[in-house]
């Protein structure tokens, strides 16, 4: 499989503020942005695995995948890597925090679907196991990573995060969205509908479309049904958050890049 891609990184450091004479300088907030774009064959999957931060998927204007990952925090951005793994089933993207246990190193392992087998966090560590066996034990810091993914309609999408929201805006393909502590939001039209299965273990499910709703013993909610006639599947799941399905109008967000054509595998760093 041929992959044409670019990975560019830019860092912005906020100016430290002067507070008082006894504590003259507060820590500087650091923001670093990583961009990637490339092409994979039709019918494959684009999946994003995050730990601390949001994942938002949008329909791409063109035929390439576009990825924007923004790190924010006071720690060194190099402590969290953005891994892009090309494989025969598609593309897997992970926010990779430092390993906490050499016996369980983090594995950005590709999958074909599914959520979390295990996801637990403390103040300093997280234990993550996906259904496919990937994940690991990692050290947490104050860095969060927010992803925006633009996906061509010919590709499937899977988004996962622990502490953050997962949202899909007017995607026209199969979608899986999994969060542990955050919400799941999906905007779609009747024409872009499909078979919906939404489950919140401790929260609620709200829908602007007619779906069958079932309470899970007063501690969660399940919603299922079909929207329109599209032959696609939307699997939405959260543990502690809510799920929202809303009617959306076709619109594209303004491109965040300068629109210049880019080809080849390379790193561009601007600090």
Regions found by a protein language model. Give the residues of each.
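Short, surface-exposed interaction patches in beta-rich subdomains
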Residues: 26-41, 68-70, 77, 96, ...
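Right-handed parallel beta-helix
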Residues: 35-41, 45, 83-174, 222-237, ...
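N-terminal, post-signal-peptide region of Sec/Tat-exported proteins
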Residues: 49-83
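Short beta-turn/strand-loop junction motif enriched in small, turn-promoting residues
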Residues: 53-54, 164-165, 182-184
């Amino acid at each position: 499989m041929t992959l044409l891609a670019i990975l560019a990184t830019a860092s912005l450091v906020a100016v430290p503020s002067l507070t008082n004479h006894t504590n003259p300088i507060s820590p500087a907030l650091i923001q670093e942005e990583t961009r990637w774009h490339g092409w994979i064959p039709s019918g494959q999957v684009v999946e994003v695995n995050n730990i601390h931060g949001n994942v938002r998927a949008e329909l791409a204007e063109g035929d390439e995948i576009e990825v924007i990952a923004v790190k924010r925090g006071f720690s060194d951005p190099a402590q969290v890597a953005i891994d892009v793994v090309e494989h025969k089933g598609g593309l897997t993207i992970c926010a990779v925090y430092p390993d906490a246990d050499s016996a369980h190193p983090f594995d950005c392992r590709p999958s074909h679907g599914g959520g979390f087998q295990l996801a637990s966090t403390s103040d300093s560590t997280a234990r993550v196991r996906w259904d496919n066996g990937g994940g690991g034990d990692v050290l947490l810091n104050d860095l969060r990573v927010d992803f925006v993914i633009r996906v061509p309609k010919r590709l499937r999408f899977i988004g996962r995060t622990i502490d953050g929201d997962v949202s899909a805006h007017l995607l026209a393909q199969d979608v899986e969205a999994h969060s542990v502590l955050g919400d799941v939001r999906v905007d779609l039209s009747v024409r872009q509908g499909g078979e919906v299965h939404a489950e919140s273990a401790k929260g609620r499910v709200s829908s602007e479309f007619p779906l069958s709703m079932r309470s899970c013993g007063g501690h969660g909610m399940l919603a299922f049904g079909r929207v329109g006639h599209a032959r696609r599947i939307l699997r939405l799941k959260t543990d502690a958050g809510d799920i929202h399905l809303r009617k959306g109008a076709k619109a594209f967000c303004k491109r965040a890049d300068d629109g210049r054509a880019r080809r080849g595998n390379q790193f561009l760093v601007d600090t």
